[in-house]
UniProtKB/Swiss-Prot annotation:
Species name: Buchnera aphidicola subsp. Acyrthosiphon pisum (strain APS) (Acyrthosiphon pisum symbiotic bacterium)
Residues annotated for K(+) binding in this entry: 181, 183
UniProt enzyme class: oxidoreductase
Protein name: GMP reductase
GO BP terms in the entry: purine nucleotide metabolic process
Similarity field: Belongs to the IMPDH/GMPR family. GuaC type 1 subfamily.
Gene3D superfamilies in the record: Aldolase class I
Amino acid sequence: MRIEEDIKLGFKDVLIRPKRSILKSRSQVNLARCFSFKYSASIWSGIPIIAANMDTIGTFEMVKSLSKFNILTAVHKYYSFEEWKNFVCLSSKEILNHVIVSIGTSNIDFLKIKKIFLLSSELKYICIDVANGYSEHIVSFLKLVRDYFPDKIICAGNVVTGEMVEELILSGADIVKVGIGPGSVCTTRVKTGVGYPQLSAIIECADAAHGLNGQIISDGGCTVSGDIAKAFGGGADFVMLGGMLSGHKECSGDIIEEKSKKYMIFYGMSSVSAMQRYEGKIAGYRASEGKTVKIPFRGGVDSTIRDILGGLRSSCTYVGAEKLKELTKRTTFIRVTEQENCIFNAFKE
């Protein structure tokens, strides 16, 4: 047993210090990024936000909406091959270029993804997704996928420490997904006592990844656009969103009406709801590590995306970053004990 004495930080623990700027308007800020990758020869350009590969968020409908903003969607792994086939046949090149195909680490997953990628050469991205990226099994599976798909852009996770980021990159990942327990409907930290505050995880993992010409995705913990700015400021190359995109018509799930108000169900992928839906039961050796919540229906996702992007542009303006790429080097974090004046929060409409 050992104790690390330095305090690790989450988004609520800091603010970004404003700096002198020559920008006259938020409209001058360019949020697009362009990345090359360690293994894949592909070049990616777009706004580096990703819809999470949760079954309620990473849907084909979400792909169609977010592709208009040049934003990626990590499509969840529970679609059948036939559903993939129908989607690919009916989708344009522009839409398919914004799809990340998510898989688990079983032999069935591997066989399925091989079939999916035969459907179109426009599919370029793979996300190997498990809750615990510290398993030797994900490393061996990653090597298998990299050998079979040498030209695809592969991300793998989730981890929260630099040494495992390095392990995954050296084993074939172009991008590593960072985050254990910060999600809005995740209870892993309280159920297991395991986790890492997200901002510190980003800072440490970005340093490890960039030293090997890799990238990271910050996965989880963002509740407002300011948190997304902090993630980019801390060194994240991409930011993955789940809860912030929930409750929209592009999400899967029924709309529930109660007392003339509409709601949607949103749940974590290790929750009772998810396990009962896909496995039929909770295995005797497992515990739920997720919540199920009922959230107000918010209509189409477009207005939410515009609000997020507007907040990001404003963040860049406050520190003088003309491009999102410049935000990290323009960011100075200050430790704080407060974030906002909450006096009227109870009166929000």
